[in-house]
Every structure is written in C-alpha cells, then in structure tokens.
Amino acid sequence: MKVSIFGAGRVGISIAYSLLHTKIADEMVIVDIDIKRAEGEVLDLYHSTPFLKRCNITAGNPHDILNSDFVIITAGASQSAGESRLSLTKRNVKIIRQIAAQIKKYSPDAIVINVSNPVDVLSYVLWKETKFNWRKVIGTGTILDTARFRALVAKQCGVSPMSVHAYIIGEHGDSELLVWSNATIGGVSIKRFCQFCTNKNCTPLESLFEQTKNAAYEIIEKKGATNLAIGTATAALVESIYRDEKRVWTVSVFQDNLYIGFPAILGKNGVEKLVPVKLNSVEKEAFERSKEVIKKYIKEGEKSEREESSSN
C-alpha cells in the first residue's frame, strides 16, 4: 500500500511516523519544496524501520506520487500564534490548487486526506479542483477537537476516553459546536453523569469545551505548532479506511455544497454515509452559523483567486 504526503514539516512527518507504527504502508513518498529537508526527514524515518515493518520511504517530486492509494496534504503556510485558521485562506488556496492538479494527474484513484488549514475551506477547494467523487476527498475536520474534548472529560471524570462519546461538529475553528444533546459517558447523558460525580474540583463542562476550542492556540503559543495528536489522528484515519473498519469519525465531508465537520462512517472507498445525528434547535442554529462562516471564506478564497488571475 502506497501513501504519499505533501509537506515535510512537523505535521507531515508526525503523520509519516505514526503511519510507520500502523505497519500498513509498504511505500511512502514525502514531497516538499525543500527537498533537502525532506531527504533528511526520510533518512531519520528510515532508521526506525528495523524496529517496525519494512517500508520503502523516499523523498520525491510530485510525479513520484504516481498510483498512490492515499495522498495526504499538510503543505501550506502554518498558523501563527493568535491567528485564526480561516485567516490562512488566501495564502493556502493557491497552494492547494497546485497540489490538486498534481494529484489528479498522477493518482486519480487515490483517497485524498487534507490536513492543511483552514481544513474545511481547503478540502472544498481540493474537491472542486480534482473533480473527484466527494467520498474520496476527506478533511480531518473536527476529529482532533472531538478527541481533545473526550480526553479532557475522561481525565476529569476518571473514565477511559473510549467511554466518552461526544461530537464536535462544524468548522474546525472558532464557530465549531459541541452536540451536547448526544454527549454520553458509558451510554449515560454526560450532564446526568456529572450529577453523580465525586470529583469536588470539577471544571464546568462548558469550560472544558472552551478549553478544547482554544487548545490549538495554547499549544502553538507554548511549542510553536500542533503536530503529534493530528499525526496520530490522521494515521488512524488512513488505517481505518484501509482496513475497512467502518468506524465513525468527525471529519470534514461534503454537504450543502461545502465541506464541514460531521460524523461519518468511513470504509475502504472513503465516506460511506453520514451519521444521522439529531440536533436540537439550538444546535441546528449553531451548525447553520458555522456553515455560513465557511461559505464566507470559500467566497473570499475564490474572489482572491479571480483577482490574482485578472491581474496576470
């Protein structure tokens, strides 16, 4: 199985490293405009293969992604401290368009996973430019936001994160929302569970959600980038699709003519179906507002591209 990754930065290499530990890839190609860095990262990664399954890892050019089973995109300008993900739009849309053309040319049958931010906007651009079936173009969406919230709740409540079931949907960013009406711990409403919690130092659930929303900003401020958790999450996505596990993930998927974070069942061909999550009236309104935020930035990205084209 062949995986190609655009971007040899911290996120791209964290994904590659996590993928090595899944032991599913026979071949891996790392593509970056800084070929020297890509070669150095590949050499470092290759030295770990004696401890894992053998994998042919190379630093390459776009044509080296030929006939990939998966193409993962992490390339683009990175998010600065305090910067909104959506403010990255104009800088990254052009890069994604160039990559889309290369994927379409060399790996037209690949499943494409976009990690670059703003992930919802860029996943839409990627789908539109490749003209692939939307089921095979997936953004990481709110997969990490959902995981962060589950981890925070699990730590506070003294349970396994795997026993916390809650979805964060919408934009991977400031307008995302938590589906409180469906959030449970061990099948019990999360708010009901907390009524019987013996932890006397509990942080209010709403505050945990705010911590989740601000987690990336905090990590960027302290260490410069988020890379380890998203590396693990992306590798888990690839593995679950490759193994046809039919797992539910909150990923950025196509609906209502945009890409947005929503629970979906993923199988060997990509998105199999969206989970019919029932939202209450407040959640529906918040979800619609999040859609409008994404639509706004899609329009801005398209506008900037038209202006650039007309000036050339």
Swiss-Prot record:
What keywords appear on the UniProt entry?
Answer: Allosteric enzyme, Cytoplasm, NAD, Oxidoreductase, Phosphoprotein
So where does substrate get bound? Answer: 79, 85, 117-120, 145-148, 226
CDD domains the UniProt entry points to: LDH_2
Q: Name one GO biological process term.
A: glycolytic process
Q: Where in the cell is it found?
A: Cytoplasm
- What superkingdom does the record give? Bacteria
Q: Matching InterPro entries, A to Z?
A: L-lactate/malate_DH, L-lactate_DH, L-lactate_DH_AS, Lactate/malate_DH_C, Lactate/malate_DH_N, Lactate_DH/Glyco_Ohase_4_C, NAD(P)-bd_dom_sf
How the protein is activated or inhibited is described as:
Allosterically activated by fructose 1,6-bisphosphate (FBP).
Q: What does this protein do?
A: Catalyzes the conversion of lactate to pyruvate.
Q: What is this protein called?
A: L-lactate dehydrogenase
Organism, as annotated: Pseudothermotoga lettingae (strain ATCC BAA-301 / DSM 14385 / NBRC 107922 / TMO)
Q: Which gene encodes it?
A: ldh
